Each structure stands twice: as structure tokens, then as C-alpha cells.
Regions:
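N-terminal accessory regions of S-adenosyl-L-methionine
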Residues: 1-118
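A short SAM/SAH-binding and catalytic strip from SAM-dependent methyltransferases
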Residues: 205-217
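A short, conserved alpha-helix within the catalytic core of class I
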Residues: 214-226
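Conserved beta-strand signature within the Rossmann-like core of class I S-adenosyl-L-methionine
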Residues: 229-242
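Conserved S-adenosyl-L-methionine
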Residues: 159-166, 230
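Conserved class I S-adenosyl-L-methionine
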Residues: 139-149
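S-adenosyl-L-methionine
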Residues: 180-199
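Conserved SAM-binding loop of SAM-dependent methyltransferases across substrates and taxa
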Residues: 150-162
Length: 285
């Protein structure tokens, strides 16, 4: 991360950056409380016009300069061999909001002479690998996302033909960044919230390494609120913050949402072997 242009506190040696780096090394349940304070500090001290190259945004990471090759191949196959190729290609183009042309070229682009960003290609690949095509998304009226990073996924999904209302549940310090970004992009049907009770039962809930990183009590609140959501796309690591997510999802979550009456599919992600292994879990009617 030493080549990131904008360090929290102005340099790698600043107290803000060191606090963040220490939290990353520890990898315990205090990581997010630390990152909330750092992200809030950066929001008020660093230029929003270049937030995609803040060191804090990269630390999480909300933004990627490189992504696993299988995601790249998934994207390339989709643009060449499916009827939605042009939509997919357009959806991953960097809008140059939150970064400059130089930032894109030096840090964010996936290919030379192309504005496809690595981050957006990875988000699209989650949808592709789990079967969420423009045809499927365009028939939905409400989507909930649990933790949206900087907010790239809703912009991609709208570009794929979704026209409904998109709810994002996230931490306040992350929501303020998403809200700024989505305002600049011109979105008017994205609802940002920090409280579970404001979420509706939806056609789809997306949660990539978010729901399964929540405290168990908060997960229970979420399931009580939107457990009847029709479809789920969850990406998770088996072990995180001392919790066995495989056991939780199998023995608790799937029972709570009455998944026995729905199609449950696990899709291994073998190129992400850390934390006990990584998978997608999809639930459909």
C-alpha cells in the first residue's frame, strides 16, 4: 500500500495511518471501530474527488487495483459469449468520480487503454457467478445490500437494467461516503440507512463479506426484519472474528428463513482460501 497517493493524516507515519495499519494486522473485532474513526477523519480532511485512492479505502479494501484471475475470466467470457456483453462492458467503466484519469491509469484500471476498473469487474463477477443477469435483475423492484463498500454495486445493477429502489445498510461513516458518490452519479432511488428496522423485505438481498462479519445479535435482528426476502446472494469466509460461519449459516440462518422450501446453492471460491475457505451462498424460490 505504500504507493497509495493519499494517506490518512498525510503520510504513512501519521498516527491515523498507523492506527489503521495496526488494526489490520490484529484482524480482531476492533478492526471496524478503528476504521470508522479513520474513515470519518478522512471524509473531513481528504479530497472527496479522489476518495478511491485514500489509503483507508484501500485498507478495507473497498477498492482493488488487482483482482483474482477467475473474476477477470468470468467478465471476459460474459462480454464475448453472452447476449448482454455490451451492457456488462458499459457497467464496469470507471465513471471518473472519486478519482482522476491519472488515478485510474496508475491504480484502478484492469486493462491498458480501457476504463474498466478492477473493483467494478469484481462486483460484476459476483453477479455473473451467481446467475444474476440483466434479465433477472430487471424484473426486481426492491434490492437490499448489506455493506456496499463505496457503493459500486448499485450503480452496476442500475446499469444492468434494474429500475427499482435499492436500499443499503451500512455504517454511518461509510454511508456518508456512499451518499456523496451516489449523488454525484445522479442516483435518486438509492436509500442509505444505518438501522435494520428501516429495511424492507426485498426481492434480493446482497451481502458480500458483510452479513457474515456482523455480530450474531445484529444478524438476528436483520433476519427478523427481512428474513422473508425472496432471494439472497451471500459471500462469506468460514471463520471470521471467532465465529464459524458455516455452522451459523447451516444450523441457524437457513432454518430461520425457512430455506427448506427454497433452492439453496453453495458455490466454492477456491482462489480465496483464507479464513477457512470462502463460498457464495445463493437462495432462490
Amino acid at each position: 500500500m505504500h504507493d497509495v497517493p493519499l494517506w490518512s493524516g498525510g503520510s504513512y507515519s501519521s498516527p491515523w495511518t498507523q492506527k489503521m495499519e495496526d488494526a489490520k494486522r490484529r484482524g480482531d473485532d476492533q478492526y471496524w471501530p478503528v476504521m470508522q474513526t479513520v474513515l470519518n477523519y478522512d471524509y473531513h480532511t481528504l479530497p472527496l474527488e479522489r476518495f478511491k485512492v485514500w489509503s483507508s479505502v484501500w485498507n478495507v479494501p473497498f477498492v482493488h487495483s488487482h483482482i483474482p484471475e477467475p473474476y477477470v475470466w468470468e467478465y471476459l467470457h460474459a462480454i464475448r459469449h453472452t447476449p448482454y456483453g455490451e451492457q456488462y462492458r458499459a457497467a464496469v467503466q470507471e465513471p471518473l468520480i472519486g478519482c482522476t484519469e491519472a488515478d485510474l491509469h496508475d491504480h484502478l484500471s484492469l486493462f491498458m487503454n480501457d476504463k474498466a476498473s478492477a473493483t467494478r469487474v469484481q462486483h460484476l463477477a459476483h453477479l455473473l457467478m451467481c446467475g444474476y443477469t440483466p434479465d433477472v435483475l430487471s424484473r426486481m423492484s426492491t434490492i437490499v445490500e448489506i455493506g456496499s463498500g463505496i457503493g459500486e454495486m448499485p450503480d452496476i445493477i442500475y446499469k444492468l437494467g434494474f429500475t427499482g429502489t435499492y436500499y443499503i445498510l451500512d455504517l454511518p461513516e461509510v454511508s456518508q461516503l456512499q451518499r456523496w458518490y451516489h449523488t454525484q452519479l445522479g442516483h435518486t432511488k438509492i436509500v442509505h440507512t444505518n438501522t435494520v428496522r428501516t429495511l424492507p423485505v426485498a426481492d434480493l438481498c446482497i451481502a458480500t463479506w458483510s452479513f457474515t462479519e456482523m455480530p450474531l445479535a445484529l444478524r438476528a435482528d436483520l433476519v427478523r426484519q427481512i428474513g422473508q426476502t425472496s432471494q439472497w446472494l451471500i459471500a462469506y469466509s468460514r471463520h471470521i472474528f471467532g465465529i464459524d460461519n458455516e455452522q451459523y449459516l447451516t444450523n441457524v440462518f437457513l432454518s430461520q428463513i425457512a430455506a427448506h422450501s427454497r433452492q439453496v446453492t453453495r458455490i466454492p471460491i477456491p482462489f480465496m482460501p483464507w479464513n477457512g475457505g470462502t463460498q457464495y451462498l445463493t437462495i432462490r424460490p
